[in-house]
Every structure is written in C-alpha cells, then in structure tokens.
Amino acid sequence: MPQTTPPLDRATLGLVTLFLTSGATHLVRPQVFEGMVPHVLPRRRELVHASGVAEIACALGLLHPRTRRAAGLASAALLVAVFPANVQMSASHAKRARRRGDVGSQAFFAGTVARLPMQWPLIRTALRAAGRL
C-alpha cells in the first residue's frame, strides 16, 4: 500500500523559508559563512556555495508532494552535516568574546550557543516532512 505524502504544514514552510533565505545568502555573501567552516576542511568558499545550493534544492524539493519525502531526508542529513559548522561558529565567537570582553561580542556568542539546540527541531521538521516521524 503506497504511503501518502505528508502535508505541506507550517513547520515545513518555515523550514523552506529558512533554507531559501540562508541558501541565497550563502551564494550572495559567502564570506559571512566561511568562518563557520571547520578549519580542518579545505576550500571554504566552495563548501559554502555547495551548502547554499543544497539548502535551496532541499527547500524546492520540500514544496512539491512528489519530492517531499526525499527532500525531507536530504534536509535532515544536511542539517546534521552542517552542525559542526555551527559548533565552529560558537567556538570562534567564544574566543572573540573573551578577547574583546564587550557586551555585543558576548551577546553574539550567547546567540550562537542558543542556536545549537535549535538544530534538533529543524531536523525533526525535516523528518516529519519525509514521513519518518
């Protein structure tokens, strides 16, 4: 018996919007994201561009019922794959906040730390779109 395609709900539309916005920014202003790429990885600019294209592809795939399941799985995988970049961003901003000691740097660092657990609800949304939850 074929499975029905999960509906395009608000959470999935939110993920689509997030991916489209972030993906476009990756392509237009890659320098914003290059510092997030873990230092052990080469060719940062190319990785930023590739992740932007992947985000846009996932977003578009989530919109269409025929591709939603595959795009949901790809979206979850992408969110897991970029998690080290989010950790790298927090680590970099922790150093900057300690070095500068100003409120703005400390607040930005706090935001990067708060962002880390927010990745899990996004992954859950992607898996729901794939019909896996």
Set out the residue ranges of the language-model regions.
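Short amphipathic, positively biased membrane-proximal segments
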Residues: 1-133
